[in-house]
Amino acid sequence: MKDYLKNLFAARGAAFWLNLLGLSLAFVIFYVLMAEVMWHVTFDRFHKDADRVCQVFYKNEDVTKQRKKVDASWDERVTTFSGFILKEILDNTQQFESAFCLFNTNRSSKLSPIGAEGKEMEPVNTVIWHCTDDLFNVFTFDIIEGDTALFHDSNNVFIPLSLAHKLFGEEGPYVGRKCMGDSFGEVSIGGVYRDFPTNSQITNDVYQLASQELQDRHWSDKENTTDMLFVKLRKGANGKQVSDELMANSAELREWADSYEFVPLHDVYFMQDATYKTLVNYKTFASHSIIIFGKRNGNFTLVWVLGLVSMLVLFIAAINYINFSMAMVPYQVKDVNIRRVFGARKFPLRWNLMQKAIVNVLAAAALSLLPIYFIVQHNLFADWLNADLAFGQNGYTLLSMLGVVVLLPLVAGGYPAWYVTSRKPAMVINGNFALSPTGRALRRGLIAFQFTLSMIVLLTLTLFLSQTYYLYNASVGYDRDLILTAEIPEEYSQEIRMQTMTYINPMIKALRENPAIKEASWSNFPLGTEFFGGHGRICNGDTIWFDAQIVDYNYLSTVGFKLTEGREFTPEDHNGMIFNETAREKFGLKIGDVFYEPRYNYIRDEQGNYTRVPEPPVKFGHIIGFMEDAHYKDFRSEVAPMACRFANNFLVRYIVVRLASPEQKEEVIRFMEEQNQMISDGRCKLVYHTGDDLVSQTYVKDLKYLELLTYGAIFTFLIPLIGVFGLVLFETRAKRKEIGIRKVFGATTRGILVMFNMQYLRTLAVCFVVAAPVAYVLYNEWIESFAYRTPMHWWLFAVAFLIVAIVVCLTVTIQSWRAAKERPVETIMK
């Protein structure tokens, strides 16, 4: 150990410290990325008996084929049922330990605490979910106050602790306190639960037992597919067997679906083929997500790549460390084997060498804790990560790091220790192991392996970034660069719904008078996002499904949609509709076609069952024109049938402005703020989005991970460069005499540099051949979620290889320049 400490400040100390720093940096990157990976892979695993807690889906191939004809984004699995079918499921199997239905009657509501004098206080926005009474037997709630028995009274609600603090302050007790809901009357607090972790499908909302009347209505409803079912299977129950049992026991269930699936809740997160469309409840797009219970999807490919990068960074750093250890063998081998000649035993010598590796790895791990602590304290990666990086929240990640700390010294110290002591002492003392073929091949093999791994990451990232560039720059069929969207908060939008003209008309009029604005309009959905309203309407005797955008009469000219036939809206065209070409081709539509909206009435019989009775349909709209197809949603969805429909007094959510020039955006925003303050008296707080802003929000997960992958890729490349730096340093020292002799026989400095560079370029070429197909496969896995994608150009691979080659050549040239410039006489005589 004395020799070890002395060597820290020897000529080889710089390489040691560089290696130690690289390993420490790898630990930091591993911790940050792996914490995020663990956040995803442990999604909804906090439930008791998590493997038996399932969400129920069904498949119906005929329905899927029909729906995909009109909606390409319709998925294979569907999770929303009619209440009647859910009752059939519950009545036809005994394989559920417990089960509850969640009725889609939720509304974003205001909940007002009632004070001691019976006066309502400041309301708080929340969401109410109505369920059947087995909720707490399926999901695991951490009840802080109250008793789940109180849930059996539909006058009680259970709320999260965060909402209790907003309603009543941070001092309890809360149970028994009264609140007034704007859509469901007075309720009592029956219990308070600890907020769910962020990696859960379950939202921190208000849960209330559905009234018997509401349950009866849903149980008898065969038509409205808006309800969901969550179950806990009995021990030993198999989802496939339960599905077969249901199909055998009920003709209604056989008619409804081809099969039923019981997917563990922790697996639902990574499902990409599940439809939740009927659960949309409109809420602010930018600052909130659409309220869809359980609609949180993770991209398994991106998470897998992120985990791969985290491990590769550490693995590459470990290889670097092994390579450095092997490069030090020629400096250790003679000293160790001289000791063997004088009687030293192998085991103590090997243990002495391994102690150095143990101390190095422990030092690197300890050193990494400082930047990790700094990152946690300053919340540096909050914009990129979902995970909480605090040490107490990442036990699995810390255990993984501990495993590396234990295993790495065994490999990095064990192999060189065995290698140094495995030769006959006499041969070692008389020979020169510095340039032995075995040692050289091993070092180059490790470097090649490092570069193969890092090039896989770099090439994959290059392809990912090409698709990202495409998302921002591809033609979308309207003038995205000139569009500025102002979002009206939901609360104010609801307030002005019945008096739209008192806010919208003065606002639009003022905007049109500004010379920096070419046109202004409004709509109920933003363009370029995944959220759009769907309609099923009757036309020519058939029910047609299409996306619909409710707009002002001048919307098409504002956004730049181009007519192909017919005319644009006029202020008198109430309920006029303009369809895209996809709709015309699929449905054979023509100008003048009329659409009708089906209407139903629910009649309750003496037993309390509801029957849905059709009523005469009402006119929904008529076609006045057709327009070119445009990417009105995100690039994950194919262009589907879509209509713009002009309707007054609708729920206005977005003011849409066409700028005279993109550079005038800030000027226009200031003007809109001034007008908004005057018209709404400061009650409306507009949120502004450009076209690129909406793209960023739509692909926020992908873009966050791409940023993380970018930094990870940089480090996976830098760490092998450190290895190249050390290896060239070693080889130039070991080959000083060879270089001198070559120069005596006429070799030039340029020739020497080319010799060194060609060795590494050949290695890089082999690495590229191996890495390119792997990167191609990884990219294809990710790109499958996009209906529209950029072509995979060959030159992307060439450019990536060229950049890597240039950086490596610069590193090799800089490091070997001094040796190549030395005078031959000096190098030969030394």
Task: Specify the residue positions occupied by each region the protein language model found.
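Structured, solvent-exposed hinge/loop segments at the ends of secondary-structure elements
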Residues: 30, 34-173, 181-186, 251, ...
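Small-residue-rich transmembrane alpha-helices
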Residues: 32, 357-423, 466, 759-821
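Membrane-helix entry/capping segments
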Residues: 6-15, 249-310, 331, 376-400, ...
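Alpha-helical transmembrane segments of integral membrane proteins
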Residues: 15-29, 303-323, 356-368, 397-405, ...
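Intracellular coupling helices
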Residues: 2-10, 14, 18, 317-360, ...
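Mid-to-C-terminal secondary-structure elements
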Residues: 131-145, 157-297, 509-698
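Short, strongly hydrophobic transmembrane alpha-helices
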Residues: 11-41, 51, 440-467, 478, ...
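Generic structural signal for small/hydrophobic residues in well-ordered secondary structure
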Residues: 19, 40, 56-58, 89-90, ...
